[in-house]
Regions:
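Hydrophobic residues embedded in beta-strands of well-ordered beta-sheets
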Residues: 34, 69, 170-172
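ATP-binding glycine-rich loop module of kinase domains
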Residues: 20-49, 72
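Helix-rich C-terminal or lid/interface subdomains of diverse kinases
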Residues: 192-195, 209-278
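Active-site acidic catalytic loop and adjacent metal/ATP-binding pocket
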Residues: 24-27, 142-188
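Conserved kinase catalytic-core helix
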Residues: 46-63, 77-118, 133-153, 161
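Active-site Asp-x-Gly
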Residues: 168-215
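Conserved short submotifs of the Hanks-type protein kinase catalytic core
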Residues: 68-76
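Juxta-kinase regulatory segment immediately upstream of eukaryotic protein kinase catalytic domains
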Residues: 1-16
Length: 278
């Protein structure tokens, strides 16, 4: 497969990044600079496949139904969560994206449906039966129902590894649109960004705990995200309630995609820790 990629693209060097349902290849020129991204579905290949170039333009953001997709690389590097200027650029990109794609209200009916569907799915996971996920989701529903939201387009996986920053012109490019929704919950992308800031490290539970206590590496980024969300949504948001919701959604995703037991149980423990915070 490596020879096939080299022959089809003309690039001899690349970096692989594994995702749930695909493998991404970042193609490098002779100087080692990224030039293109290939998204290759996890499937059988007979090496007659064509590489389909794509240019994303709203609302057609999702991946086309082809095995191999090619996009130009529009960044210097992935977002650095410890660089507050990078975080601000990502937040500016997200608020502009939501302002430009907002539509009708994300009302109490939408929130009720979202929460009840999540409860029903989580009921299948034995490892959390003794944890108060129903109670935490009811708290989430009560909390966000009091806030006026508009539906917006949702990237669906707006986290550090999918955000590229161009240092030359201080612009942002976002990759991996496989979970894109044209209309959805505007909180999802903010919480994905926050989670990817504070759940990192060899011990994600302790990393999260230290960031929430105000002693972790990502505290400046977390403060900026909180401030931006409160101003953008014109509300006093309870971040613990929102993070519980985020962790439960990741836990369900990992359960469905049969992720490694280490990754899976990390989120069980993250939710356990968050559920114990008053």
């Amino acid at each position: 497969f490596e020879d096939f990629i080299k022959e089809k693209t003309g690039f001899d060097h690349y970096i692989q990044a594994s995702r749930n349902n695909k493998v991404m290849h970042i193609l490098l020129d002779e100087s080692g600079d990224p030039k293109k991204i290939l998204s290759c579905k996890r499937a059988k290949y007979d090496f007659t496949e064509k590489i389909m170039p794509i240019i994303r333009k709203f609302p057609k953001m999702k991946d086309a139904n082809e095995k191999i997709l090619s996009e130009d690389w529009f960044g210097n590097d992935h977002l650095d969560r410890l660089n507050i200027n990078h975080v601000k650029l990502a937040l500016d990109w997200l608020t502009n994206f939501q302002n430009n794609t907002s539509s009708g209200s994300f009302d109490s009916h939408d929130i009720e449906e979202e929460v009840e569907n999540l409860k029903s799915e989580l009921d299948r996971i034995e490892e959390i039966h003794n944890l108060p996920y129903h109670k935490c989701l009811d708290e989430y529903k009560q909390h966000v129902s009091a806030i006026k939201f508009k539906k917006t387009a949702v990237h669906g996986d707006f986290q550090v590894r999918n955000i590229l920053v161009n240092q030359d012109n201080l612009s942002v490019n976002v990759i991996d649109w496989s979970a894109f929704m044209e209309k959805g919950n505007p909180l999802i992308d903010f919480l994905a960004l926050a989670g990817s800031m504070i759940f990192q490290g060899s011990d994600s539970v302790e990393e999260c705990r230290s960031n929430l206590r105000g002693t972790g590496k990502a505290v400046p980024a977390l403060k900026l995200i909180k401030k931006t969300m409160n101003e953008y949504f014109q509300a006093d948001l309870d971040f613990i309630i929102l993070l519980r919701f985020r962790v439960l959604k990741i836990l369900l995703r990992n359960f469905k995609t049969k992720r490694t037991s280490t990754d899976y149980f990390t989120y069980v423990e993250l939710f356990r820790m968050l559920s114990e915070i008053n």
